[in-house]
Amino acid sequence: MDHFDQDTYHNLPVEIWKHIIDSDIDSTINLLFSCKQFIGLVCILTNNLNLLNLLVKKGNLKFLEFYFRLNTETNKLYTEQRLRVEQNECLKMSCIHGCLEILKYLISIGVDFRMNDDEPLMLAIENGHLKIVQFLYSKRVNIRARNNRPLVLSCEKGYINIVNFLLDKKASFVSKQNEVFSTACGFGQMDIVKLLVEKGADINVGKIPPIRAAAAGGHLNVIEHLVNKGASINKCSVDSLFSAAFYGHLNIVKYLLGYISEVNIIYYAFEKACINGHIDIVQYLFSENIITKDIITENSNTRYLFYHTIRNKHKHIIKFLIENNIFDKDKKYPDILESAPKDMDPYDYLISFLNYQ
């Protein structure tokens, strides 16, 4: 390179240049490959994986080849084991970033594209790279690896193009646990839900039934679609209500209350909302008189509700309940609030007082 780059290199000690490049490889990568002096720093960088990741991400195959050749030929500390580790990582990075040319190159020099039970395939699916998935399939990877994980993962991420490809290649969504379909429902991937329903997916059964999965994920549109398609909501309405309350999905709680009237069941949903800090559900159930002061105080499990809500430090829930004169009758909450130091929020004091008893 020109004298400017060489002079620039000699203006600072090698240790300083190493620190500069290590601290921000994204901004300094072009400097690293500007002249032979800077290129020599490649062998002493602290985290070479950052550099390799950037080269793969940019699709810089020539620089990648040069990196391996430079280290192999000039770096006495560069062992065969380190070479294999870095090449394996580069192959995984090529699947993450969708760099087909680099993937092909690494496979051509013998890097194992089926490492760790087809991890490269999983990484390509997780990041939505259909071309990588198609190429790996042509290399005879197992598209049913890890108990059908490729299809489950593509449903989770919502990549319908990959789902279609896997189905075309005879991956099956049918299983006793119905994991593929329930996953699509749980992550709200409506296009995939519709596709699988059209192909005959069971809309009722599963280790986690589809409606319950959708309730836990907060996807009312999926629940409504399944019900419209004939799903039996009554069979899983209770567990679905509990899941919606646990995860804080008020719109689904409202919807499911249209199918549930038992006070004890609704109380336990209220309890889950309290313990997990979902004030909007708590206030809604209370304001609509679905849950009342009498229902709470007369329930034999009130102590459990307060204990865990306080342990989880949900001050806004505790404050709401006490301001409505609702509390575990065995605890003198008003007295504790009154005894709070003047420089401390009374409810913070209550929580700290009860948590350290």
UniProtKB/Swiss-Prot annotation:
InterPro entries: Ankyrin_rpt, Ankyrin_rpt-contain_sf. Disulfide bonds: none annotated. ANK repeats lie at residues 34-63, 86-115, 116-145, 147-175, 176-205, 206-235, 237-265, 267-294, 301-331. It comes from the Viruses. Keywords: ANK repeat, Repeat. PANTHER family: REPEAT PROTEIN, PUTATIVE-RELATED (PTHR44207:SF2), SURFACE ANTIGEN BSPA-LIKE-RELATED (PTHR44207). This is Putative ankyrin repeat protein L42. It comes from Acanthamoeba polyphaga mimivirus. The lineage of its organism: Viruses, Varidnaviria, Bamfordvirae, Nucleocytoviricota, Megaviricetes.
